[in-house]
Structures are given as C-alpha cells and as structure tokens.
C-alpha cells in the first residue's frame, strides 16, 4: 500500500495580499503531491486567488501547478512594477 507523506511548508504573503489577508505568513501541512494552487485553496477556500497573482517557491518564480516539497517556502505576491 502506498501512503502519501505529510509535509510542512511555509507560506508568505506580500504587499496588498498581506494587507488583504491580515497576515504575513502561515505554516501549512500538505500531502506530497500538493501544488502551489492547492495550497492557496486549502488555506483560503472562501477567497479565490486574485487575478495576476504571482507565486514563488524557495525565492524562484513558480507556476501554480508546481508541486512543493517538505520545508519549501511558498510566496504569493501581486505583480511588481517599477520605474
């Protein structure tokens, strides 16, 4: 029998997402095959991911379909512009 292990990831929120959610970070336990999008849905089931939100895993841009590993840091942030 194959059993999914449970992992813990750290979640960080930046800029307007941090303000909207009222917190800067979370810790979340997930199964081995969990994606970045599933993390958001698990933490915020009543709050859809805002359009154009970017994600990073371990400080590198990531797609919402990327799976995470134990101990990963997942960050969500709005698009960044500058001048």
Name the predicted role of every residue range.
Residues 1-82:
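Ubiquitin-like/PB1-type beta-grasp interaction modules and other compact soluble beta-rich domains
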């Amino acid at each position: 029998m194959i059993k999914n292990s449970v992992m813990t990831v750290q979640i960080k929120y930046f800029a307007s997402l941090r303000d909207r959610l009222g917190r800067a970070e979370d810790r979340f336990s997930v199964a081995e095959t969990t994606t970045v999008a599933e993390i958001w849905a698990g933490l915020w089931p009543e709050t859809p991911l805002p359009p154009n939100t970017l994600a990073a895993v371990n400080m590198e841009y990531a797609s919402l379909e990327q799976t995470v590993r134990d101990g990963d840091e997942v960050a969500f942030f709005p698009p960044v512009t500058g001048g």
